[in-house]
Amino acid sequence: VYPAGERERLLRITGAADIKDCSQLLLDTACAWKRGTAEQKEALAKRYIALLSHLWEQGWAEGSSLGTTHHLGYAMRGLYPSVLLMRTVLESAGLMKKAADMLAWFSGRGRIFRREVRWESMDTLNTLLQGILYSILLEKDTGKQAAYLHTLRKWLNGILRPAPGLKGPFKVDGSAFHHAGHYPAYAMGGFQGLTPVIYALSGTEFQIDAEAFETVRKSLFMMRIYCNRYDWPVSMSARHP
């Protein structure tokens, strides 16, 4: 955390790169690798591993304390799908476990083991949930993978029931809470992060239960009522519609 008014000067002195830019570059490289020719793939794989290895060397690895002062979900969300796309390259290089452990750490996968949880931040659904799922899918031990998926299902069933008090993400009336109030702008991101995970788990023994699904469904359809193109009171839109 840079002192107020000193950020630009210190960045010039240190030559620091933003982790968000690095994360996006990893994803762009992985997408290009997926579509590339054999020759292009070889070069792109080397670039991907070089950048990821540099991040590890700088401390962006399992066990790091770099993310304890603030939420890193928005800055690092390009990382998670990039590792999934590059899994064969990482496996061949003997780096798969280190990459998977990195995903589990920075996505905060440990949260799914908390018991009797009835709420979760909308930010988690938006920026971390898919990373949690990817880290589980990269688990090579199928027994552990199944156990993690069952735990993920149980956790989702808890947090996707109507949340108590001013907690999020969803309420019994279909409103979507963040920052202790109804906040549609954050809800949109929450749905974008959550619904692909619900879809990925559907039709399997790990799919969410009917009550959790109905809570999400009701909140999504409620948007048709409270969204308005021209007139959104602050009480319905929080800081911005």
Briefly describe each language-model feature range.
Residues V1-P241:
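Aromatic-lined, polymer-binding surfaces characteristic
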